Amino acid sequence: MKKPEPRIEPYTHPAAGWGALKYVALNLLKEKVSGGNYRTLFGQNQPDGFDCPGCAWPDREHASTFEFCENGVKAVAAESTSKRVTPAFFEEHTVEQLMAQSDYELEQHGRLTDPLVYDAARDRYVPIAWDDAFALIGDHLNRLDDPDRAAFYTSGRASNEAAFLYQLFVRMYGTNNFPDCSNMCHEATSRGLPGTVGVGKGTVTLEDFEHADTLLLFGQNPATNHPRMLGELRECAKRGATIVSINPLRERGLERFASPQHPVEMLTGGSTKISSVFIRPKIGGDFALIKGVAKRVIELDDAALAEGLPRVLDIAFIAEHTVGFDAFAEDLRAESWDAIVAESGVPKVEVLQLADIYARGRAVISTWGMGLTQHKNSVPTVQLLSNLMMMRGNIGRLGAGLCPVRGHSNVQGDRTVGIEERPTQAFLERLGAVYDFEPPLEHGYDVVQSIEAMLAGKLKVFIGLGGNFSIATPDTPRVWEAMRSCELTVHITTKLNRSHLIHGRDALILPTLGRTEIDMQNGVAQGVSVEDSMSMVHISYGMNRPASANLLSEIAIVARMALATLGSAKVDWLAHANDYALIRDGIEKVIPGFENYNERLKHPGGFHLGVASRDRVWITPSGKAQFLVHGIQFDTPIHRARTIHGERLMTLMTTRSHDQYNTTIYGLDDRYRGVYGQRRVLFANQLDIEMLGFEAGQRVDITSVWDDGITRRADSFLLVAYDIPRGCLGAYYPETNPLVPLSSVTDGAGTPTSKSIPVLLCASAVSQLEAA
């Protein structure tokens, strides 16, 4: 397909609608999806079909014929493509040559067909027999003098069964080194919520959206990241719910939505207004904004109490279910409005407006994405939002609750079944008892710690169950240095990506079945299970013929790695690879909530795993929900850098384009933001562009400001005048990941602060002609 001409052109249509249908058709053609595989779309997110390999948004219990979205089609088309990367492809391309290609070009080559090993003499990947590949892995692992010298990464696309077997193998091997994609996204949620409500998961289901009268949407862009959420928001808006979007960018999907599932809306050119109100904090201003809302709620309650009016606070809930409220209220009363306004970037009148909306709501849901979780203070921010919801009893009742919207399709499920570098003692005891071994007790490495350990020479083997580790991570040049220092890198994957080219001394690419493909073991079709963002667990069966006869399932690959490394004295690995129900039996024995796992999966749509805080059961030291007190931070890296550089210091947030999913680049457009045929763009306020002495359309280089003496720069970005708060910038990752310092992480969660990068701009040394 011809590369489009780069251009900037405002998009005037609603999200989805005919534009989405056009792009669906173009993607199916671009991926050369065969006629038979087109039918796969009608099995997407259906009870007897497969779970979308894209986002973690839940499926409706009563599914329609079309339970897919534009980005889901992109994911399925990419997996169902007829294009193949065979051994012959690598005969024609060295690794050095492939490194010169863009991430988009690498994605477009198609599905991998055979296991491959790196041949250093020829700088090529060459075929290897499966048995030899597993023997190489077992040899490397068994030669290490300490199991903690290996790290085992997991992508959120791995199924519950694959993830559970993986963690069992790794813990029997002897380490808790489980860097996971969740370390880079919603870790602040997983670490923050247990401190307040006891469980690091959301408390709502889709049913609650049917009863909510107020929705607060923090730091997310559903039209791109989880488009099916727009269907729920549309229904909420149609019945009169108040929807408030709290985001630095005024995203198109938060403005208007034309539903492809509603013919009248499509045929008449109509659309539905989604947001009633927009609140635009500066990047990183959410904590101060939420604190301002909570302070106003206290003021409203104080006034009501003084005048003998009904209380604004849910006094009964606070008294029965919480501790710590008095200290929290005292802190709010003492907080300065000047500090709240300055640090949030939101005028006081808008903070009061948001507080009034919240106080009037009888059933409030708060949702959030990575706009809340990739800052230095994200754990306190999540906990403060939890505090706000507890003030009016908006947790554990119909139509109300906490709704973190996670990214990849099974990122939550992987954590549930044991992909956790900091496992609880109770989990390890149950795992050891069921499988008759002593699991390692010492906490392992997360993503950033794994990279630091590689750079320090402590990690020598890296195995990745899916993902694109070398591109998804921060501080790109240092990550590449770290990966190249390994003795062995292994990637279990469906398609070629950059991480396969950033390899260790020995390197393997192990191709696996995709979610859309039939998984036959001993003549029996196997299903795998996943857990969505609202704790619903359901079965997924592939429908397409495998892309190659030489593919193995993720579970088979994990089982055979384990067999080659550990033998079968404790676990019959191959039996588990032949019958996934055996793995689910193990999950049932080890993890509470999975009772009668195999039977419950037979119910159309699966089952709800159960979240204690949804039932107002608080798994905290006090046995109650806990109000926690946090102050506004005035000494962050952004503050310190601005003290030195003044108003020239900008705060950069990384974001996705509409044509990508995580690090997978499906195309070069971001049409809702008016960007076409290019990715190296930098969104900036027109007044900032002028203040800095630039012009829109000019190329600039971006340098991050950090205190470790390392120069971090990303060159030749096109300045685009955009509706974004002063002092704030936006650009796509992974192009801007080199700007994120490895040591810049969320306190208490270790997440790279990819939404809070202090940067300076200068005119680009690369001409516009060269950049194009």
Residue spans for each PLM region:
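Intrinsically disordered, low-structural-confidence terminal and linker regions
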Residues: 1-49
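Short cysteine-rich clusters marking metal-coordination/redox-active sites
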Residues: 49-55
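Short, non-ligating residues that shape and space the ligands of small metal-coordination modules
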Residues: 61-62
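Short cysteine/histidine-rich metal-coordination sites, predominantly Zn2+-binding motifs
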Residues: 67-78
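Low-complexity, highly charged intrinsically disordered N-terminal segments
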Residues: 77-124
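Non-catalytic alpha/beta scaffold blocks inside enzyme catalytic domains
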Residues: 116, 187-387, 391-397, 405-588, ...
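Long, structured ligand/cofactor-binding scaffold of large enzymes
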Residues: 125-214
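Long, low-complexity segments enriched in small/aliphatic residues
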Residues: 576-671
